[in-house]
Design a protein with these regions (language model features):
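A short, exposed loop/beta-hairpin motif centered on an aromatic-Gly-Thr core
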Residues: 55-65
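A short, structured beta-strand/loop element
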Residues: 26-57
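Short, compact, well-ordered microdomains
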Residues: 66-122
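Basic, alpha-helical nucleic-acid-binding regions used in initiation and control of genome expression
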Residues: 50-51, 110-134
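Alpha-helical interaction segments
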Residues: 1, 61-62, 96
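Eukaryotic non-globular interaction segments with acidic/serine-rich, low-complexity composition
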Residues: 1-29
Length: 138
């Protein structure tokens, strides 16, 4: 699949485009913006719950900047694809806390699904650790 920064968006002509990772773009227009994820990249990088938040327009799954873009950011940070931002504005941990507050307010169903997924992953990891410890003890 060929990846190319978008020049047009559901919010208008793109005046700035930052590539977050292959197939994922943070775009700004004269008046608005968001995150645009090429459809095949969305299927590969985002959970079904995250995909459900976006809206399809052309070859992109789109996430409006005010409420829905944090869904993509949370997924990319969780998977280690991007690092949490730290700079003069965000000290360590503050960027993720900001994303989480936004998700809890604007996308509570996604937040609950994410928390459930993390709990299941933690339980699975604990079970595997216990099983390995038991096998070593034999």
């Amino acid at each position: 699949m060929m990846y190319r920064e978008p020049s047009d968006s559901p919010w208008g002509v793109v005046v700035r485009c930052d590539t977050l990772c292959t197939g994922v773009y943070s775009v700004s227009t004269a008046g608005h913006g968001g995150i645009m994820v090429q459809t095949d990249a969305a299927r590969r990088l985002l959970s079904p719950e995250a995909q459900a938040v976006g809206f399809q327009a052309g070859r992109y799954l789109n996430f409006e900047e005010d409420c829905d873009a944090p869904v993509v950011l949370r997924e990319l940070v969780d998977s280690g694809i991007i690092a949490p931002r730290t700079d003069n504005y965000f000290r360590p941990g503050e960027y993720e806390a900001c994303i989480d507050r936004s998700l809890q307010r604007w996308n509570p169903a996604y937040w609950r699904a994410r928390q459930k997924r993390l709990s299941v992953q933690a339980a699975k990891a604990t079970k595997e650790l216990v099983e390995r410890s038991i096998l070593r003890g034999r």
